[in-house]
Amino acid sequence: MSTRTARSLGPDLVLAGTVAKRAEILVVGLTSGPDGPEIALSEGIVAEDVLAEILDSLIAVGATGKPEQLTRVPAPSALSVTSVLAVGLGSADKLDSEQIRKSAGAAARSLSGIDTVATTLSILDLGAAAEGFALGAYSFTEFKSSMTAPGPDSQPLARVELLVPSPRTKETKATLARSAAIAEAVATAREFVNTPPSHLYPAEFAARAKALGVEAGLTVQVLDEKALEKGGYGGIIGVGKGSSRQPRLVRLEYASKKRGARKVALVGKGITFDTGGISIKPAAGMENMTSDMGGAAAVISTVVLAAKLGLPVNVVAYVPMAENMPSATAQRPGDVLTQYGGITIEVVNTDAEGRLILADAMVRAGEDNPDYMIDTATLTGAQMVALGNRTPGVMGTDEFRDRVASISQSVGENGWAMPLPEELRGDLDSKVADMANVTPHRWGGMLVAAHYLKEFVPEGVQWAHIDVAGPAYNTSGPWGYTGKGGTGVPVRTMISVLEDIAVNG
């Protein structure tokens, strides 16, 4: 079985029972231990004496099995490949799916210029290995000219043969199909985030979201600026009116074939570029605000993925899109706007715009009577101050918040449950409107933003808010299966939550 994740988004993933002659390199896992490194399980696919020869070569050049350590040695003559790449897995007794995923990604990143590899990592965990290789090999080169585009010797890895004992079973094929679909969804979210705002503005973003939705069989509706104005979407209009690029609201609905299936609303912040508006940001690092639609990218990719997987759960996604710019028509600090549904807001700071567009979309999503609601956004710098750039903050109704955070940790996206202290809500009181969009102080900024959003969650709906301000965009060096730029977080969390709801309600 072979499955291509998407054009240029990842390598061809192929199930195999033996190392084919086409493969140039065999990738194996190496665990560490008190008695030295060991090659991880191979299920008889590679002969024991050959593995022993490989291990001797690896030890001779100093391989230890340290997590994601890469060591390449010539292949024994008994193998058809030219070399063996060992990737460290760490201690065998601590090995889990996420480490396999990260190690596979590290291997994939090191294999530019290689057409085909075979790997035994898939014997340990087929799904994790497939996702790791696919995401590690992802690259974004759309805007590279012929002068700087990767040449033949530096193209991303093209094909991965995933070695398993029984490559033709229905269960094995289904596992690979799911993992390939997840990798494609994550890569699609990365593509959106990495596309510059000159090419991905609200109207274009909406058009691309619609095209993906229609292709997946979703019901799609796009509201333009006139429809938003007429409908009373004051938050989206207020944020977007400073830009010549008019705002949009996209609705994508996946209807399960299962009678009585639970309904989940997904809402994602889609600020295609954020200058801060009149409350303008410092110039240093502002170019990274191309990532301020990371939540929207993840939501679009997730609802499309739910349809492709045929999940027995209903999903309705709302994606508000706007560009936050300073101009003569931009909203001002001190303005008052009316959110969809009627709550009036004093705009104290125009750089706290994400919550304004999310609130409109959340109230509208509530009209679809969901059982659960998840919103996600690159919402606050305070998230990075509190949790760093790899740990999303998860807030919301206690039980569902903890459920989402637990699932996020299990899939390697590491969401962390955070409280919503009641005393912080009072800091959003306004003298001129129902609420202010920020507090007069900077304490607990991530939690205050969640308190703001909580005001727009319908009564009785289980809700989780995932702040991915840091985790959605990697500004440091590559690691594991994550390169620089868009990461696709929290697609894997949200699809796993949908799967969990489909099974457990």
Swiss-Prot record:
The name this protein goes by in its record: Probable cytosol aminopeptidase
One term of GO molecular function: metalloaminopeptidase activity
CDD domains referenced in this protein's UniProt entry, alphabetically: Peptidase_M17
GO cellular component: cytoplasm
Entry function: Presumably involved in the processing and regular turnover of intracellular proteins. Catalyzes the removal of unsubstituted N-terminal amino acids from various peptides.
Example GO BP: proteolysis
Gene that produces this protein: pepA
PANTHER family found in the cross-reference section: CYTOSOL AMINOPEPTIDASE (PTHR11963:SF23), LEUCINE AMINOPEPTIDASE-RELATED (PTHR11963)
EC id: 3.4.11.1, 3.4.11.10
UniProt-annotated binding residues for Mn(2+) 2: K269, D274, D292, E353
Sorted UniProt keywords: Aminopeptidase, Cytoplasm, Hydrolase, Manganese, Metal-binding, Protease
Catalytic reaction(s) noted: Release of an N-terminal amino acid, Xaa-|-Yaa-, in which Xaa is preferably Leu, but may be other amino acids including Pro although not Arg or Lys, and Yaa may be Pro. Amino acid amides and methyl esters are also readily hydrolyzed, but rates on arylamides are exceedingly low; Release of an N-terminal amino acid, preferentially leucine, but not glutamic or aspartic acids
